[in-house]
Structure formats: structure tokens, C-alpha cells
Amino acid sequence: MASEAPHASAPDCAPASSDIPQQDGGSTNGHGHDLKGHGFFALALGSVGVVFGDIGTSPLYAFKEALAAASHDGVTRSEIFGVVSLALWALILIVTIKYVVFIMRADNKGEGGVLSLMALAQHAMGKRTTLVFVLGVAGAALFYGDAVITPAMSVLSAVEGLRTIPALEHGVTNEVVLLIATVMLLGLFFIQSRGTASVGKLFGPVCAVWFGVMFSLGLMNLAANPGILMAISPYYAVEFLAEHGLTGFIVLGAVFLTVTGVEALTADMGHFGRWPIQAAWLFFVLPCLAMNYLGQGAFALTTLETAQAAGKAMPELNWFFEMAPEALRLPLVLLAGAATVIASQAVITGAFSLTQQAIQLGLLPRLDVRRTSETQSGQIFVPQLNTMLLLGVLAIMFTFQTSSALAHAYGLAVTGTMIVTTCMAFIVMRKLWKWSMPMALLFLVPFLALDITFLSANALRFFSGGWLPVLIGAALFTIMATWVRGSQILTDKTRRDSLPVADLMDILRARAPHRAPGTAIFLTSDPDMTPVALMHNLKHNKVLHERNVILTVRTAETPRVSEEERVKIEKVNDDFKKVVVNYGFMESPNIPKALAVCRKQGLKFDIMATSFFLGRRSIVPSANSGMPLWQDRLFIYLMRNAANPTDFFKIPPGRVVELGAQVTV
């Protein structure tokens, strides 16, 4: 059963806002925090833990997997220099130039992320277009595939470091690694319902220590073999790709692991602001990552030289952990475990936030979204999603069992999301920023070519694991597309079968029904059509309240709506008023609070003498709905399992009256 109430996730609740999304970040972040002095430093430090947690744990496995892929015909200095050079230039071209310089400018009132960019692109186009919609939904769907893989990949790679400790290398079997990783992940997912605000303050400092340790380890090994500094030249990356053919292309797929997590730079702009994130990357995170990759390369060179001197083959090592002195490996594993848990937390929080946005923008049905902090708006918990993520992460971990096996599944979803981001940024540049076509193409062509190259390289891993995020993304895309299409069909049918409010007023003037004391609020998605609940009340109860409010909730294309724009009241006649309540896609609807604003604007009523009328619709599949029968059934399943509108809109349950009707779709 599903409600006919104004559905924040129904397409007919079209995003509508007079606010023009800003083209550039200002001196505050999306939440109005001061970006000067101590405040700027605090935000930059906080971003180190949340924004860069994922990309900051890539050194655990990226260099190892890339060098293993390059060693198909054995390892020489050429392979080591080539892999390090490719890693460094991936960080420079993709993260620094593409994201920090260009993509982060495309913020939507301080917010970023694929759905925020979709809303901005739609605003720039001036209308909803199929292209932008498909791009946005595809990008969001692929993110969920990444969100399932990241925790398993990160935590496994950290726990596997125990095998590099001489005293533990024989006792730490694969089963032990899986057990420890499972306990860590179970603990992480179980604390989500209580929120992470209390421990979240430690994320930045812990990750700052992590990056500092990575820098120190890299510097220590670089000092022992400084020749690796030549890999900073792009010549070695180009030479490697030119000389290694298909192997070089395969290595590109592994090198891409160095930039997984890059989307977090835009997704978390609303929490930390553009400038603190950019400063943290340029002056701290990038130098630490670059130094660590150089250090791993230097350690690999030293190992190669030692092996060649002894007449032996180059061993396959866990380069990150084994470049540390043996006495420091256990503390390093513990620190890596903490860093990967923080990285996983950031991904989980990102999934919760994306889900909230998708619900508000009409891409998903209502879900139970709970706030876990009274003071921090970003602290939310989505129980159904948390359970699905946990089951998905554990299933993936026990299926692939090692980080090396999982590496084949990692990357394909991220490259897909990056292509979506590039295309929508191009639309914003052309339509909103008014860049000339040649100037916009200077951005689009090289970066889209780079994205497609990495996508093609990762596609070679499709059958060895790359199918997994694609399958998850395809499933989520189907769910979102079905929900949007089904909701639109339902809205169109309801509109065809409904009576315009103006016509109802004429009927009521001609035949006045019995009047009931108090106020009735009828929730609907279309303020111009008579709500189904109102028609049923007149038809079956044959009464009309003294005061009647037709209330609609709409979602804007901006993350937040000012209090001045929150409520719009239109008087129909002495008995009826229309109220439209506007929310941003980052906000949670709260009808009682909105009604308090209405009272300030002169709408008088007693909440204890007010009844909320909701229409409950029983959906029956039809062969002529415009969707295949399987899609009809999926839509009905989604509607039946949507969160109760009473809870979703925070309506006092004791004041709700529900009236049902059967509808075919």
C-alpha cells in the first residue's frame, strides 16, 4: 500500500526553485562555516579523515597490484619506473587538474556529488532532460557498487598486513584474515545506528597521522634509493605504455586504484567547503601519497637489485608493509586498520547521504531516514540500506577472500561515475557558466578520453570480478528508473481522474455540504488538482471542515532552501488555502515545523483541532500501463515497502486519517 500524500520522491513533485546555484565556492562552505584562520584549518583537518580516507588507503594495494600486473614477463627497472610514473601522473591529471581545478568549481550552493551535479545540470538546461537524468541515475547507481566493494577491499588489505610480521606469518591464514576483517566490519556497521558524531572528531587527526606515517616511510626508502625520483617525469609512464602493449593497458586498470575515492572530493564539499579540501589535497595529502608511492618504488628497486645480485628472481611482496622495519609493522597494521575503518565509514556515510538525496529528488521510494545527531545535519542513518550494505560487503568478502582478487572488481564502477561527472560538468560549463564551445571542449575531450581509456582498461577485468559493481549498478539503475517511470504513470493517471480545485469550488458553492469544526489538511503532490482524500471525504463522509488546507511538498534543485522560501501560501477562498512547502534535496521534510512557519504568515489553526488526511492507494498491475508487467510488479513492491508517510513527514500519528482507493498501473 502506498500513500497519495505529497511524496518527496515522486517525479510530479518537480524540483522548482528561484534560487540560482552558485558557480563558485565563496568564503564559506555549504553550511556557512567561516573559512578563515583556525576554522579553515579545522575544516581542512576534518576533510583529511572524511574526504581523503578512501584515496588515502589506496597505497595499501594499488602499487602492489599494478606491479604484479606489470610483471607478466618479469620485473625490471623499466616496470618499476613505469608503474610509479603512471601512479603519480594519475594523481596529477585526474585528482589535481580534473577534480581540484575544474570539477570542484561546479558546486550546487556549496554541495557536490553526482546527484547534486545532476540537479545543477538540470537547472543549467532550464528543464528536465532525459540525457541528464540518465547520466545522474547511472552515476548514483554505480556509486552503490563502489560502496559495497570499498569496505571489504580496504579492511582486507589492512588485515593482510599481519602476514608481513615474521612472528605471525605462518599463523595468519586466510581464514584468520577473513575472521578479523568480519569482526571489524560487523562492529562498524552495528555502530551506525548510534551515530559517529562522538568519535568523528578523531577521524581527521588519526588520518593525519596515517598520512604522516606514509610520508615518513616513503622518505626513508627514497633516501636509500633516490634514483626513483626520475619517475616523476611522464616520460617513463609513456615509455612503459608504448613498450608493453596489452600488458601496459592491463596495468592501467590496476594503476587506476590509486585514484579510487576521488569522487569524495566533490561529494563532501557541503561539509567542509571547497577551499579547505583543495588546500588539504595540494599541501598535505598529495605530497604524502606521492612520497609513499615513490618510497614503494624505491623499495622495489632495492629489492630488485638485491635479487639480481643474488641471482634470484624478483619476489612478490606486500610492498607497503614490508618497506617498514619489522619492529614497526604491527603498529603500522593497527594504524592501517584504523585508517581503513575510517575510509569505510566515509563511504557508508556517503551512501546514506546519496540515498537521502535520491529520495528527495524522486529517484527512490521513501525510506526510514533517522538523524543520529541533533547538531550535525549530515549525521543520518538509513536502517534498510545499512543492512543491505553489510550483507553485500560480507558476501563479497567471502566470495573473493583476498584483496588481490577484489582488486579486479574495484575500479569499473568508479570509472563509470567519473565519465558521468565529466559529461555533466561539460553541460554546466556550457549552459550555466556560458563557456564557449571550444573552451568547454578543451576540458571535455582530454578528460573524457582519459576516463574512457581507464574504463577500457578496467573492462578487461570484467570477467574476473569487474562484473560485480556493474551488476549492482544495473540493479540500482533498474530500481530508480522503475520508480521514476511508475510514479510518473501514477501521477498522470491520478491527474486524469481528478477534479481541478477550481471546479470543486464551483460545485461546493452550488451544493454546500455539512460543515465540521476544526481544520483539515489534505496532502497531495499536485496543488491544482483535488486531493483523492478530499474527494473521498466528501463522497463517503459528506462533510467539509471549517478550514481546509491543500498541502504540497516540493523538492528544489538546490541542497537547502532558505526559511523565507520555505512556505508559500495561496488563498483560494474563505474555506480553502493552498500551501506549498519547499525543501532542498539535502533536507528532511518536517510538516509540523513547516506549519509553525505558516502560523507566522497568518494561517491560523489549532494543531490539536487539526486532522491530516492521506490517500492510501492499492496498486493493481495492468498490461496497458506503459511498463512491462515485471516492472509493474517491481514498482508495486517498492510502493508497498516505502516508509509510512506519517513517519516520513513527521506528522503526529494521532491526527492522521487515511482513506483508500484502488488504482491500476
Swiss-Prot record:
Biased composition (Low complexity): 1-18
Positions of transmembrane segments: 40-60, 83-103, 131-151, 171-191, 202-222, 245-265, 281-301, 332-352, 380-400, 409-429, 435-455, 462-482
Record keywords, A-Z: Cell inner membrane, Cell membrane, Ion transport, Membrane, Potassium, Potassium transport, Symport, Transmembrane, Transmembrane helix, Transport
Catalytic activities: K(+)(in) + H(+)(in) = K(+)(out) + H(+)(out)
Localisation: Cell inner membrane
Gene Ontology molecular functions: potassium ion transmembrane transporter activity; symporter activity
Membrane topology annotation: Multi-pass membrane protein
GO (cellular component) term, any one: plasma membrane
Disordered as annotated region, ranges: 1-31
InterPro entries: K+_transporter, K_trans_C, K_trans_N, Kup
Pfam families reported in the protein's UniProt record: K_trans, K_trans_C
Functional note: Transport of potassium into the cell. Likely operates as a K(+):H(+) symporter.
Similarity annotation: Belongs to the HAK/KUP transporter (TC 2.A.72) family.
Descriptive protein name: Probable potassium transport system protein Kup
Species: Caulobacter vibrioides (strain NA1000 / CB15N)
Lineage of the organism: Bacteria, Pseudomonadati, Pseudomonadota, Alphaproteobacteria, Caulobacterales
